[in-house]
Amino acid sequence: MRQANLIMMSAAMLLAACGGTKDAGKTDQVLIEKSDIKIEGKRMTPEALWAMGRIGGFAVSPDGKKIAYTVAYYSVPENKSNREVFVMNADGSENQQITHTPYQENEVTWIKEGTKLAFLSNDNGSSQLYEMNPDGSGRKQLTNYDGDIEGYSISPDGKKLLFISQVKTKESTADKYPDLPKATGIIVTDLMYKHWDEWVTTAPHPFVADFDGNGISNIVDILNGEPYESPMKPWGGIEQLAWNTTSDKVAYTCRKKTGLEYAISTNSDIYVYDLNTQKTENITEENKGYDTNPQYSPDGKYIAWQSMERDGYEADLNRLFIMNLETGEKRFVSKAFESNVDAFVWRADAKMIYFTGVWHGESQIYALDLANDSVKAITSGMYDYEGVALFGDKLIAKRHSMSMGDEIYTVTLDGSTTQLTQENKQIYDQLEMGKVEGRWMKTTDGKQMLTWVIYPPQFDPNKKYPTLLFCEGGPQSPVSQFWSYRWNFQIMAANDYIIVAPNRRGLPGFGMEWNEQISGDYGGQCMKDYFTAIDEMAKEPYVDKDRLGCVGASFGGFSVYWLAGHHDKRFKAFIAHDGIFNMEMQYLETEEKWFANWDMGGAYWEKQNPVAQRTFANSPHLFVEKWDTPIPVSYTHLRAHETRGN
């Protein structure tokens, strides 16, 4: 096994170069621009991957004639990125970059009946709301708020601005002890003591302000005086808040808990704030799991949101609910789809909802008919769609696969697609990608498992190739047609490896029984599924059984550690990134206790709890004496600490 190449793959993000020039206006600012990289050998490299522009959000003009979107460019030497705005016609023609600044334009939307584009930018050091003409001229700052504006939504009548900004919710050590003004230490007296990558001293709050088109006034904190988050950390954004159609109510997502209660519960709710009365109503109080991402119907008669049933289970089925705003009747409308509802959007007449969801290793667009709650797939093929939105009588979405990053497409209701953007064509034209195919394999318990196999470019079945087993993280994250800028299968394949990526037990898109089997059974059937995948592929004459490797991150890192103690000399090399090594220490150290309690089944000291005892009996550290294969270890995880790699 070429160990140097294998290690390089896990660290591909560390090596690259993108173009950058000094901005003429401010000599200390570097303008990171589109790369003109030249690639030799037609193989994917870390440099090529980092040179790619990354398409972000998009917005369709009110008349349906224009599309605005953002693209981020990266510079490894500068250790940062820069996001710019593009505008194109509805058919993809006349695509123009309309900003050329180092100021991170993002969250672009159309305002003032499509005559202006609104966006966030940090021109003057903090993130504020700006506007410009659709050709990039007439740039104007609209807000001068004291803090950063992290997300925003302008009301349907155009007269109010809903925005997100951080509010201080906890005293620092220096606040508590004025005689120690330079103190930076953290005094921990309660959970959660941190959340992912930060010591939690602030919370995002939703604010509403009057907006006259030139600035804001009469700013109101919807959660004034409350220590809660809306949107919820660490990943929530403006999608967790929504205007009603008459611009006098805001629905927001919030988990109104603190301390230990916050650390053990996923019970968030949808609250509706009335701007006129300043009263708040909880419309999902009876549900005990996550309730998130509200959207009002275009006719104003309904509200839809995503809902998980069980408290503490962060990977529960993400169901779509709607509520009749007149009668209060609630309905679980996505029962016919036994997988998670991801992005969704109402049809203009409110009789249909379009959504994306993973099924059998692909994220497709579906139509949900609210007359009978039937679900029909619109798209097909080896792709993942995301970020679906209405586009006249069509849909618009981003699409990617294991062989291509995000581009923007239109989708007709019969499933035909048109690619609108060609952001990285100049790079793809220089590359030869490896073939991707799906194989169904019989597992040890007689079920069928979809496994993706990625071959090297110019694959020759008469040769023998080193082969990697890829172990997915999550643990309940799909092995769909994802495109990764970290664990990129085409970079691995470009170095003449075959990659085997099984949809082992514990992944969505194959029904609830398949998805839920992993909870409390980390060392069980999912590990047998891994062995099935690599053993089946090892039967192929072009797989070199003497050069098998195994790689993974997060739960995949745990899998690597566990397999290292049980692989019976199958593998010649491992790579573990961000994996749990000692389950007992993980239970004590991790801050999101709901995850540990549900997935591990309880605490390790609960001797009468058979699920917990099975979990901790399968901790990888208990099998170290059986390790006989090198394992490069790295950590940047925010829920499994670097101490797991010691």
PLM feature spans:
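C-terminal motif of bacterial Sec signal peptides marking the signal peptidase cleavage site
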Residues: 16-17
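Predominantly five- to eight-bladed beta-propeller fold
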Residues: 25-33, 83, 166-225, 253-269, ...
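A short helix->beta-strand "capping" segment at the edge of beta-propeller domains
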Residues: 34-53, 219-225
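Conserved beta-propeller blade repeats
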Residues: 52-67, 102-120, 139, 146-161, ...
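Short, solvent-exposed loop/turn segments at conserved positions within beta-propeller repeat blades
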Residues: 77-81, 123-126, 198-202, 261-267, ...
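Short loop/turn segments that connect beta-strands within beta-propeller blades
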Residues: 89-93, 133-137, 211-214, 274-278, ...
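Cap/lid segment of the alpha/beta-hydrolase catalytic domain
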Residues: 423-540, 544-546, 553
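Active-site-proximal cap/loop segments of hydrolase catalytic domains
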Residues: 493, 501-646
